[in-house]
Amino acid sequence: MVEADRPGKLFIGGLNTETNEKALEAVFGKYGRIVEVLLMKDRETNKSRGFAFVTFESPADAKDAARDMNGKSLDGKAIKVEQATKPSFESGRRGLPPPPRSRGPPRGLRGGRGGSGGTRGPPSRGGHMDDGGYSMNFTLSSSRGPLPVKRGPPPRSGGPPPKRSAPSGPVRSSSGMGGRAPVSRGRDGYGGPPRREPLPSRRDVYLSPRDDGYSTKDSYSSRDYPSSRDTRDYAPPPRDYTYRDYGHSSSRDDYPSRGYSDRDGYGRERDYSDHPSGGSYRDSYESYGNSRSAPPTRGPPPSYGGSSRYDDYSSSRDGYGGSRDSYTSSRSDLYSSGRDRVGRQERGLPPSMERGYPPPRDSYSSSSRGAPRGGGRGGSRSDRGGRSRY
């Protein structure tokens, strides 16, 4: 862009608008024969735009003129004289800054990419946190997901939950505030109670899954294997959410790879999707739902998240078979305990609920409140949430 224009062509900038071609020719003519004087004018007003091009017959004369006249005053203004560049010095000059500028955007992009690309995983991995809930979730899910799940449920609990919350915010803007806060609450809960009370944490997780869809998964997988399993079971729905909420196919994929990867390993993935989303999900809900109350059967069960899900999970788990069974055992234990708790809650045993449920409950309520996102689901969820809560 900045190649020199034809030899002997000088750019004269910073001209007084009163300076005309004749004046330029008079001033520069003394350095040698001038072939052309081109004063740039405004097309509409025909006034000088303050710069001109003077072409000398001899490049040597042009160099002399540039050396002598650069910085000199002409008609009261210090002028700039230098070899003209191809596009026209100004545009050329302007072009230079752009590179830095463009560099900046890339940077921005990079950041953005990191954020959104977080989904891609590794890259954002470092930055998920920075990037934002999303990337984090995704990243975790995608990059870290599978391993981390196994690796550091606890850490994850710590970490993912936040992620979860972040996502929940964005994901469910509806749950946004509620969801997010609750989620975070859940998270906190996670930090401690979750482990203590898998159920609640899970529930939170569930909530979040519902809310976040993703992070929950992460948290699941990370948090309790069972939960990850659950997640998986869930996963189908969350997946749906994710599609819906995130619309990130990548995250979806990540999940699949992540939480789902478990599924794949189990070979459940397919089953799951079929069962959970299809029947077992619902069926389990129904079976549970019946015990619980019809609402779950509706399919909103998710709102139950906690109880129905647990149950469902357990059932689906069983249905899923061995791997699941192994999980099941742990899961079921968690679940059973969770279930009991849940049952209690439903029954109206405030203590258990309060015990560590409260956050979850809040999260539920919040999620249910924020549920708008889910639409019907949301509604049922809220109902359910209300029920379970009260």
UniProtKB/Swiss-Prot annotation:
The modification N-acetylvaline is found at V2. The keyword rRNA processing does not apply. GO terms for biological process: cellular response to interleukin-1; membrane protein ectodomain proteolysis; mRNA splice site recognition; positive regulation of DNA-templated transcription; positive regulation of mRNA splicing, via spliceosome; positive regulation of transcription by RNA polymerase II; regulation of alternative mRNA splicing, via spliceosome; regulation of postsynapse organization. Its main location: nucleus. Residues 8-86 form the RRM domain. There is a cross-link at K22, K80, K86 (Glycyl lysine isopeptide (Lys-Gly) (interchain with G-Cter in SUMO2)). The modification Phosphoserine is found at S88, S91, S165, S174, S261, S329, S330, S332, S352. Residues 323-337, 362-371 have a biased composition (Low complexity). InterPro entries: Nucleotide-bd_a/b_plait_sf, RBD_domain_sf, RBM, RBM1CTR, RRM_dom, RRM_dom_euk. The RRM domain is necessary for RNA-binding, but not for splice site selection, indicating that its splicing activity does not require direct binding to RNA. This is RNA-binding motif protein, X chromosome. It comes from Rattus norvegicus.
